[in-house]
Amino acid sequence: MSHVHQAGEAFASNAAESRQEIRNYTMNFGPQHPAAHGVLRLILEMDGETIMRADPHVGLLHRGTEKLAESKPFNQSIGYMDRLDYVSMMCNEHAYVRAIETLMGIEAPERAQYIRTMYDEITRILNHLMWLGSNALDLGAMAVMLYAFREREELMDCYEAVSGARMHAAYYRPGGVYRDLPDHMPKYKESRWHKGKALKQLNASREGSLLDFLENFTVEFPKRIDEYETLLTDNRIWKQRTVGIGVVTPELAHQWGMTGVMLRGSGVAWDLRKKRPYAKYDAVDFDIPLGKEGDCYDRYLVRVAEMRESNRIIKQCVAWLKANPGPVMVKNFKVAPPRREDMKDDMEALIHHFKLFSEGYCVPAGETYSAVEAPKGEFGCYLVSDGANKPFRVHLRAPGFAHLSSIDSIVRGHMLADVVAMIGTYDLVFGEVDR
């Protein structure tokens, strides 16, 4: 019996030593987690509920976009740009077409520049509404998602009105935009859900042109933002989940190459629309919202304020576009397709159209970097041409990639539940991170 007793004591002693040795454990967060915002895989080293280290794994959505763009004529790769950050479609297009225009030495007409400015801001609101709804849903505030998507639907209809597509528009073209703004808006049709007075009410703001619709939207949208703020800004639970969480100091933001809201939320007034104006941002009036503490709550406040500023810009663009009709594409027929009326009467115009969209055009040899202030930060396109009709090199700077690199230093010491809040406030889309 004494031998059995001694063996039991030895086993208990070894088990206790093993428990003392095993302090940290590893947890996989994603890529299937609903709060991973795509295909993010985080390998977390945990000490109880506290995060000791975070190792982000990327590449699960890598599609070789840069090499695909290098295998196509310049004007055939615009559609690939939409599929990078697939929540900020036209901003991606803008960086790419600006790079081509710089190499070719052409400038889009003034009306096209105002249209681009307006749609960049429509895209910013689309992105921030998606962010607001999904981040609030991740933290347990379900109603905000429904409110945000109500306005998002209206702006998606503005995409559809100019391009025929609700997401992948391919509306921006080197030298301008695909076509001028339409005189009508898509309308709801009668169905078992929409009929009678309800249908008329839905279509009341869609009787006029796209600009009329947007003019009405800019009047109503600030009231909608007030509704979001009523639900969240002073909400006790929302503040408990975001105040003091994921603090990014200005020094840390600079070290990690952060841009956009991640930088401005820390109090750094850097915005390409002000510092390096492009399109017509130097002709419109707007402010740069800034945070103070650099935490998740500040970044929420900055994004909400940015939606208000975007609304101001859209309002100014609508007023200018209503008063100033004009061309939306350069008259350089090396890059601009012939008019459809000409193609029906002139064989040369038909041949030119076919050659333009099958072979493209040769871009003078050179290199350039073109960047825009996308909703998530600085989205840039480095473009190298060797004089052929295809790019020699395309490199895309995705803001989310730089931001994700910093996640280990930001999440250390936080609780597991705070990871969801921090990933949400990064506003990641893996189409652009993995490219």
From Swiss-Prot:
Subcellular location: Cell membrane
Chief localization: membrane
Quaternary structure, from the entry: NDH-1 is composed of 14 different subunits. Subunits NuoB, C, D, E, F, and G constitute the peripheral sector of the complex.
Organism from which the protein derives: Stenotrophomonas maltophilia (strain K279a)
Gene name in the database record: nuoD
Known catalytic reactions: a quinone + NADH + 5 H(+)(in) = a quinol + NAD(+) + 4 H(+)(out)
Taxonomy, superkingdom: Bacteria
EC number(s) from the headed UniProt entry: 7.1.1.-
InterPro entries: NADH_Q_OxRdtase_suD, NADH_UbQ_OxRdtase_49kDa_CS, NDH1_su_D/H, NiFe-Hase_large
Pfam families hit by this protein: Complex1_49kDa
Coiled coil: none
SUPFAM superfamilies: HydB/Nqo4-like (SSF56762)
Function: NDH-1 shuttles electrons from NADH, via FMN and iron-sulfur (Fe-S) centers, to quinones in the respiratory chain. The immediate electron acceptor for the enzyme in this species is believed to be ubiquinone. Couples the redox reaction to proton translocation (for every two electrons transferred, four hydrogen ions are translocated across the cytoplasmic membrane), and thus conserves the redox energy in a proton gradient.
Official protein name in the record: NADH-quinone oxidoreductase subunit D
